[in-house]
């Protein structure tokens, strides 16, 4: 299964826990607004956070409240971004990005999830060298989407790579060019399965043992259930 299929499956799982997903998006939006201002046209981090929330069908009222909370004087709790790295079962490399107001709580929880599921939490840098930070835009096989036209628009806008998959198209950019490529595609009327700057694995790991598959699924589920966890990246090749 390609990356697009993985994203579609993940979105299906998230539909069942929509309230929790909205809470995570609201936190990310509020922090982005607090740090860079309430206007997404002048705050790239806020614009990306809003786009991600909308991709998960978060209502505009919820988004507006989160922006207002973050932009208000002395608004909200003090959150910080902390990234954890480690190995899951079968040697799968895992990166966990969190947004927390209590790093001791978050560190303890993340370590527990790894230990509980046949993995181990490592030190900073222990697996990140296996990933590249890239902008990734996924476009589905919608009506009227021409592969050739989409590729031309993406590459002319500054995309690094264009990959055709079974479920759609993957457009890769540098982190610096992500916003301009995304905005150009959106202006041309393309709709996205997802669009974000993320850590993309250089190689993937296939799990063949049933016990490893079960533990890896459980590890991802437990991490996704944690309110402090914003994003999870791994090099597990989901078949």
Curated annotation (Swiss-Prot):
It comes from Clostridioides difficile (strain 630). GO terms for cellular component: cytosol. This is Probable transcriptional regulatory protein CD630_07950. It holds the Pfam family Transcrip_reg. Keywords: Cytoplasm, DNA-binding, Transcription, Transcription regulation. Signal peptide: none annotated. The keyword rRNA-binding does not apply. It is found in: Cytoplasm. One of its GO terms (molecular function) is DNA binding. InterPro entries: Integrase-like_N, TACO1_YebC-like_2nd/3rd_dom, TACO1_YebC_N, Transcrip_reg_TACO1-like, Transcrip_reg_TACO1-like_dom3, YebC-like. The keyword Cytoplasm applies. HAMAP family: Transcrip_reg_TACO1 (MF_00693). GO terms for biological process: regulation of DNA-templated transcription. Belongs to the TACO1 family.
């Amino acid at each position: 299964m390609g990356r697009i299929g993985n994203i579609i499956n993940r979105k299906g799982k998230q539909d069942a826990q929509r309230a929790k997903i909205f809470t995570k998006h609201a936190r990310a939006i509020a922090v982005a607004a607090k740090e860079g201002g309430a206007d997404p046209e002048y705050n790239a981090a806020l614009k990306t956070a809003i786009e991600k929330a909308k991709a998960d069908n978060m209502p505009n009222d919820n988004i507006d409240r989160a922006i207002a909370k973050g932009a208000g004087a002395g608004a909200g709790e003090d959150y910080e971004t902390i990234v954890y790295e480690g190995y899951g079962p079968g040697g799968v490399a895992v990166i966990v990005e969190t947004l927390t107001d209590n790093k001791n709580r978050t560190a303890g929880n993340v370590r527990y999830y790894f230990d509980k599921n046949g993995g181990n939490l490592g030190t900073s840098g222990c697996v990140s060298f296996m990933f590249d930070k890239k902008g990734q835009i996924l476009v589905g096989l919608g009506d009227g989407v021409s592969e050739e036209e989409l590729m031309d628009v993406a590459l002319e806008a500054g995309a690094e790579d264009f990959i055709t998959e079974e479920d759609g198209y993957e457009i890769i950019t540098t982190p610096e060019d992500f916003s301009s490529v995304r905005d150009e595609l959106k202006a041309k009327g393309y709709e996205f399965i997802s669009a974000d700057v993320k850590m993309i694995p250089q190689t993937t790991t296939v799990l063949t043992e049933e016990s490893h598959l079960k533990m890896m699924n459980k590890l991802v589920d437990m991490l996704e259930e944690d309110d402090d966890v914003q994003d999870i990246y791994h090099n597990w090749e989901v078949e």
